[in-house]
């Protein structure tokens, strides 16, 4: 029987268990995927802890991103999908579909093909990161040549995707990381500037880099008290995206700074893209084209075998990585 990852109580990575499950047949609008690799995301850790946008229905599976081969399709699904190498797009609830396992059921609407030159591990590191960054930076902010964009948590897979998008559009990226030990690697990955926020004054550095104007776009997954500094670093009329809560602290609204600068501070998740068919089609085309011509390339931080799933999530939680943590599935 195929193995899947499941948890029966809330907690950290240690509550995850590898269990056997009877093979399932896909229903209407579904496919069965033989998984080759799975990309890990912080949203999944928040889900396991009961801190995500949706609460898990226990016992629950886990996982948004898998790459593999379609082995079977539902009664209303085009049979041409069978045999194709695909990866999954986070366009569903993990209470309905969970992608971390040897064999999974996925909605056909959440499948995306990836260029043949990518490995399954790289294919599992595409859609969450690039679609999250695309939706905010391109679809909403219309990032353009010469724009300054601040990218906190820049060593994450989404942060690296945002840096690559900025480079492709001719914008100037200001990556931030807590300490200076990741600076050289972030610069090598395309960041134009890197600020170590525990060692430097982010507001002063952004003002210096932008010639006193501030950044028009800020793409932040941290929130908490850090938002006040980001608002100070923003340009007049700038837009601040809050797409995460890594700090897990209360997030005071910087009212007077927002009023004085006319800032737009908005919450954002990639579901704004993935649950709208027209937006998703445009996003997939944008990402696929740039993967194909080499402007985008997933950065893999570390690969773990399926049996070490708990260790893989602990590594993700350590913040030691630069790029995507991936699990390979036998």
Stretch-by-stretch model annotation:
Residues 22-39, 51-92:
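Glycine-rich beta-strand-centered segment in the early N-terminal region that forms part
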Residues 87, 150, 218-219, 241:
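N-terminal Rossmann-like NAD(P) cofactor-binding module of classical short-chain dehydrogenase/reductase
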Residues 95-97, 177, 225-295, 328-330:
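Glycine-rich phosphate-binding loop and adjacent beta-alpha segment
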């Amino acid at each position: 029987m195929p193995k899947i990852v499941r948890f029966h109580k809330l907690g950290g990575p240690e509550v995850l268990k590898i269990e056997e499950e009877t093979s399932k047949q896909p229903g209407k609008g579904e496919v069965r995927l033989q998984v080759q690799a799975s990309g890990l995301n912080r949203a999944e850790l928040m889900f396991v802890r009961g801190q995500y946008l949706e609460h898990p229905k226990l016992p629950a599976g886990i996982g948004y991103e898998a790459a593999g081969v379609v082995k079977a399709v539902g009664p209303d699904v085009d049979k041409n999908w069978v045999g194709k190498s695909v990866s999954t797009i986070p366009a569903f609830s993990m209470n309905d579909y969970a992608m971390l396992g040897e064999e999974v059921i996925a909605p056909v609407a959440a499948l995306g093909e990836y260029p043949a030159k990518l490995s399954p591990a790289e294919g599992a590191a595409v859609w969450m990161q690039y679609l999250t960054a695309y939706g905010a930076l391109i679809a909403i902010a219309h990032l353009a040549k010469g724009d300054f964009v601040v990218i906190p948590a820049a060593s994450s897979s989404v942060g690296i995707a945002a840096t690559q998008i900025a480079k492709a559009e001719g914008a100037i990226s200001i990556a931030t990381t807590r300490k200076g030990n990741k600076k050289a690697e972030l610069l090598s990955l395309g960041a134009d500037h890197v600020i170590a926020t525990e060692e430097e004054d982010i507001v002063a550095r952004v003002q210096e880099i932008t010639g006193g104007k501030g950044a028009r776009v800020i793409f932040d997954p941290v929130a908490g008290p850090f938002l006040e500094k980001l608002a100070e670093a923003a340009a007049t009329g700038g837009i601040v995206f809050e797409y995460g809560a890594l700090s897990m602290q209360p997030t005071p609204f910087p009212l007077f700074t927002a009023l004085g600068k006319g800032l737009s501070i908005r919450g954002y998740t990639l579901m704004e893209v993935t649950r709208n068919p027209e937006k998703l089609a445009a996003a997939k085309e944008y990402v696929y084209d740039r993967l194909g011509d080499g402007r985008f390339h997933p950065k893999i931080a570390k690969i773990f075998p399926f049996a070490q799933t708990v260790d893989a999530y602990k590594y993700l939680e350590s913040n030691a990585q630069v790029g995507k943590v991936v699990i390979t599935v036998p």
